[in-house]
Amino acid sequence: MSVLGFDIGNLNCYIGVARQGGIEVITNDYSLHATPACVSFGPKDRSMGVAARQAVTTNIKNTVINFKHLIGRKFSDPVAQRFIPFIPCKVVKLPNDDIGVQVSYLGEPHTFTPEQVLAALLTKLRTIVESQLSDVKKVSDCVLAVPSYFTDVQRRAVLSAIQYAGLNSLRIVNETTAIALAYGIYKQDLPEEDAKSRNVVFLDIGHSSTQASLVAFNRGKLQMVNTSYDLESGGIWFDALIREHFRKEFKTKYGIDAATSPRPWLRLLDECERVKKQMSANQTPIPLNIECFMEDKDVTGKMQRQEFEDLAAPIFNRIKQVLINLFADGVSIKPEEIDEIEIVGGSSRIPMIREIVKDLFGKEPKTTMNQDEAVARGAAMQCAILSPTFRVREFAIKDTQPYRIRLSWNSTGENGGENDVFSPRDEVPFSKLVSLLRSGPFNVEAHYAQPNVVPHNQVHIGSWKVNGARPGADGGNQKVKVKVRVNPDGIFTIASATMYEPRIVEEVPAEAMEVDGDAKTEAPAEPLEPVKKTKLVPVDLEVIESIPVSYDVQKFHNLELQMQESDAREKAKADAKNSLEEYVYEMRDKVSDQYAEFITPAAADEFRSVLTSTEDWLYDEGEDAERDVYEKRLSELKAVGTPVVERYRESETRKPAFDSFDQSIMRVRKAYEDYANGGPTYAHLDSKEMEKVINAIEDKKKWLDEARHKQETRSKTDAPVVFTEEILQNKNVFENVVNPILNKKKPAAPAPPKKEEPQPAAGDQPQSQPGEMDVD
């Protein structure tokens, strides 16, 4: 069973794997821990991860990046509109205000949803795991981390994408919770359960957003006290700020506007990210140089850290506000009660972040956790906790949900009502019962009660129709209990609805207990009459769910499978073409060099001609041939080349094999001569067995001499008459005969006879020792 945690960031993804020795973040096919969150669509296949990101400038119109905040959102959503300009391909509005990315795939226009793009990325991550871990045959179960501020509809969208990719989600864990788990589960010095908690603030400044969490730790448990976030502070916002600065500078200096062309605009963003990172490590001005940027113009600029900090002051203020918001009304812990502050996330390396933390808490922030991998490690640990194949020390997690959820209801001919069933910072997973009086079917709706604090324009969570309620015997209402729940994935649902109907039931009273003595004198008791009682009997009601966005999981899973099959076919074809190309280059060089002695000049000329024509074909008609065509041509070339390679390799290994066999025979012959001359080493051996030894010597020596002579008379361009493998087999047969005989141990020498002690003469009696006394 795979135990995996996926951290899907806006820029990069990380894969955490639980092993017996702990959590490991594995590398991808480019030996990097970070896999870019990038999917590129081409005329023949898809590419994801590093390969897609490296080719983004050459396939910019068909590449999807920075799409994390489009998942589960509508096209008109203000957050989606803020991130769409960072996506180089065309983003379109679909029916129902859904989002689509429009690309050219397999030579035809296609429109994919952000959830489909996420599924493609998850497919790539699964492929990485299966190729990098030999003990994992097929990846199925996983835990995926999402921002703590993701709403109900976004979480459902992520679950759908996981299903599109053919994976099974054990849990969706909040990124803030994953970080806290990665921190706390290994700590040996946490306070005891009944002692004052260790209060830790985690500040995660990622690529597209900033999250903070306040967590109370005790031995064996963590409690999420509060979380806060900001969607306009993070790495991409710093990069965009620097980019805008240079855009204006280049417009004035060179008369070009990078924002008018997608390719230079994206290229400038990448360069600004590099400048930002270098400014974090250097006080000196950092240069920015781009050749042939636009209109064949080279551009140069520079920026110093102080200038960047002045430009980014509004973003730094937003990050500070995120930390302040942790201590909102209702939070009992004060800033002065914070024991530690841990900073993670790629943008936490900016020096000003440390100053903000120090200014607010009066303490230096810590960086004891891996700033890039903390979320993936925590997600993998959560997966290990849920997995039956792992034994993990007990660690209780009390998580919270961030929004106020309100339930409203109605029924035909009756006034409805509403009630807040979950408040911000309520523990999850958790269930509550709402009691209603109903006489017929009714509808229940859930929505976020404070739209201004929810970062999503879809505040309606869902509707549920409850069927089966009916009037009581008196025609009045009956009690109905509706069970509402926020499940471990952070998704709200109505788990059940139960009507409690009064019914008359008969109960036989319990008989009085007999007491010894009385039973003999009293007459037999008459049977007791049943007593009629009214009881509330639970009746399960039908609940029909209707959520704002529905996903056709089977349809999109089948589409993903088709694309995976297409990718696999194209990869197999590319591998076959590469194998043919590599063979042509290798053999063309070696036939004129190290293989030259092992092929006749005429055959070599003909072979080189075929190799050259194959190379020409590869770059002409064979540029896009089928896999079996490449394999057939390679097979035809190997029919000529393999015997040449075989002759070369045999010439390299045959002589050492002959020499080794010769030495083995000489060693055994020397042992036999020692035996024949009466030497002590083999004197204990049986003559019949030693006859087997000398026969084996003569037989194999004869074979060896004949084989060597036959081979020496052959030309190097002829096929070998004896192969190295045959020599080694004969050597093994020989040694299996002689070694057991020669290695027999000498029998143990007989023990020396015991020396007999003289017996006393008859009549001699031993003298009694003084002090001894005979007693009758």
Swiss-Prot record:
<dbReference type="GO" id="GO:0006457">
    <property type="term" value="P:protein folding"/>
</dbReference>
<dbReference type="GO" id="GO:0035966">
    <property type="term" value="P:response to topologically incorrect protein"/>
</dbReference>
<protein>
    <recommendedName>
        <fullName>Heat shock protein 110</fullName>
    </recommendedName>
</protein>
<dbReference type="InterPro" id="IPR029048">
    <property type="entry name" value="HSP70_C_sf"/>
</dbReference>
<dbReference type="GO" id="GO:0008340">
    <property type="term" value="P:determination of adult lifespan"/>
</dbReference>
<dbReference type="InterPro" id="IPR018181">
    <property type="entry name" value="Heat_shock_70_CS"/>
</dbReference>
<dbReference type="GO" id="GO:0005829">
    <property type="term" value="C:cytosol"/>
</dbReference>
<keyword id="KW-0547">Nucleotide-binding</keyword>
<dbReference type="GO" id="GO:0005524">
    <property type="term" value="F:ATP binding"/>
</dbReference>
<keyword id="KW-0067">ATP-binding</keyword>
<dbReference type="Pfam" id="PF00012">
    <property type="entry name" value="HSP70"/>
</dbReference>
<dbReference type="InterPro" id="IPR013126">
    <property type="entry name" value="Hsp_70_fam"/>
</dbReference>
<dbReference type="GO" id="GO:0140662">
    <property type="term" value="F:ATP-dependent protein folding chaperone"/>
</dbReference>
<dbReference type="InterPro" id="IPR043129">
    <property type="entry name" value="ATPase_NBD"/>
</dbReference>
<feature type="region of interest" description="Disordered">
    <location>
        <begin position="741"/>
        <end position="776"/>
    </location>
</feature>
<comment type="similarity">
    <text>Belongs to the heat shock protein 70 family.</text>
</comment>
<dbReference type="GO" id="GO:0000774">
    <property type="term" value="F:adenyl-nucleotide exchange factor activity"/>
</dbReference>
<dbReference type="InterPro" id="IPR029047">
    <property type="entry name" value="HSP70_peptide-bd_sf"/>
</dbReference>
<dbReference type="GO" id="GO:0005634">
    <property type="term" value="C:nucleus"/>
</dbReference>
